[in-house]
């Protein structure tokens, strides 16, 4: 998270996990005691994934039982970059499921959101990853039910500022008003489309895909609370 800081509220940190596998590092958010929501591109490669839940000084390491990417996801399209990760064992007691937002309409330009992830603080420097950071960003451009672009409220995407980066993918996006889960971090780029951090942060809003999330969670044996 470029320009991010440790989350001011510990309750936010208790929802979030670090996902590692092969040479990959991503973020995820618990939505049930043994189920994590993340970005599909984080878990597409063959390999063994593990989740690290941080409670106290030592992380609890959890094995992954199965992964369910959204069936329409493709790295070459704007299809939903979402996946569910089923844990082989329940997570640490300190990890709590996040509550979904009940918001059913796309955000408006200027709406504020909290993004969080374990990604790098400096693009290209993997040594700066692995620490949970958060930032407050605002909606810009044309918010829709498929994609949401967030920017630093001071820079507005015109120059580098706060924003998600490598390793933040799959991390949660919370409504700044009620702290409810409204989206998942998917990508970052400059306004010209170049993959540069600190300009535009791309988000997948969850309202459109809520039915898929609920149905898939039940198939994985982790029904979500109403």
Where are these regions (language model features)?
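Sec/Tat-exported extracytoplasmic proteins
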Residues: 20-21, 38-41, 46, 71, ...
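N-terminal activation segment of mature serine protease catalytic domains
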Residues: 1-22, 27
């Amino acid at each position: 998270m470029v320009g991010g800081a440790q989350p001011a509220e510990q309750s936010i940190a208790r929802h979030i996990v670090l996902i590692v596998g092969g040479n990959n590092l991503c973020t995820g958010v618990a939505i049930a005691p043994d189920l994590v929501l993340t970005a599909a591109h984080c878990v597409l490669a063959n390999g063994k994934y593990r989740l690290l839940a941080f409670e106290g000084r030592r992380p609890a390491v959890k094995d992954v039982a199965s992964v369910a990417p959204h069936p329409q996801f493709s790295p070459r399209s704007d299809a939903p970059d979402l996946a569910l990760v089923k844990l082989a064992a329940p997570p640490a007691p300190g990890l709590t499921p996040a509550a979904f937002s009940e918001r059913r309409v796309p955000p408006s330009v200027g709406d504020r959101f909290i993004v969080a992830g374990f990604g790098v603080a400096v693009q290209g420097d993997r040594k700066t990853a692995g620490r949970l950071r958060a930032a407050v960003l605002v909606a810009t451009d044309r918010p829709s039910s498929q994609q949401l672009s967030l920017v630093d409220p001071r820079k507005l995407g015109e120059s580098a500022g706060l924003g998600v980066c490598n390793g933040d993918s799959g991390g949660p996006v919370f409504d700044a008003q009620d702290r409810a889960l409204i989206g998942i971090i998917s990508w970052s780029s400059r306004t010209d489309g170049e993959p540069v951090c600190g300009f535009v942060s791309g988000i997948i809003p969850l309202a459109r895909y809520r039915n898929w999330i609920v149905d898939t969670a039940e198939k994985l044996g982790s029904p979500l609370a109403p």
